[in-house]
């Protein structure tokens, strides 16, 4: 049986962890996330320096690890709670749902509300102040659609790993 409170706690923890690591990167130096900014902004600011590329990799690693590992971990917990009886579709839906929760949060709260609507100064890359691309809601909607595909693939990977090893 599906444990909705457990799903909500896993989703909430995933969103909180991923958001914390992502905000750390942007607040530390928004240029570390330059690859995720709208193309119009990338065109008017200098490319990442070698040091920024190195920092993006090392400081971004915890975010990437959480992004990939947590949905799989949560799906293992879901399978254990189901006494190993959850079928592949249930495992996929659970892993997809966890990954999709952050995708939805990232799109509506982080991208549309914070990045596009509020646009904190800490998120603005020097040299791009006031650029209209900071209000490019469609750019972030496209990112959400890509994130939805990513969530579906993460669901398949997570379900496959748990079905084989769980």
Regions found by a protein language model. Name each.
Residues 1-97, 101-166:
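Juxtamembrane/disordered regions of integral membrane proteins
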């Amino acid at each position: 049986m599906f444990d909705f409170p457990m799903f909500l706690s896993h989703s909430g923890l995933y969103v909180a962890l991923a958001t914390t690591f992502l905000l750390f990167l942007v607040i530390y130096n928004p240029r570390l996330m330059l690859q995720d900014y709208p193309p119009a902004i990338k065109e008017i600011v200098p490319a990442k320096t070698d040091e920024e590329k190195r920092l993006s990799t090392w400081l971004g690693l915890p975010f990437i690890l959480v992004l990939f590992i947590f949905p799989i971990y949560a799906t293992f917990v879901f399978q254990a709670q189901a006494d190993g009886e959850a079928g592949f579709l249930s495992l996929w839906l659970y892993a997809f749902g966890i990954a999709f929760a952050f995708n939805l949060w990232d799109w509506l709260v982080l991208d549309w509300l914070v990045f596009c609507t509020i646009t904190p100064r800490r998120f603005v890359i020097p040299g791009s102040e006031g650029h209209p691309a900071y209000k490019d809601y469609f750019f972030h909607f496209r990112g959400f659609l890509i994130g939805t595909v990513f969530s579906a693939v993460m669901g398949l990977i997570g379900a496959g790993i748990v079905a084989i090893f769980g």
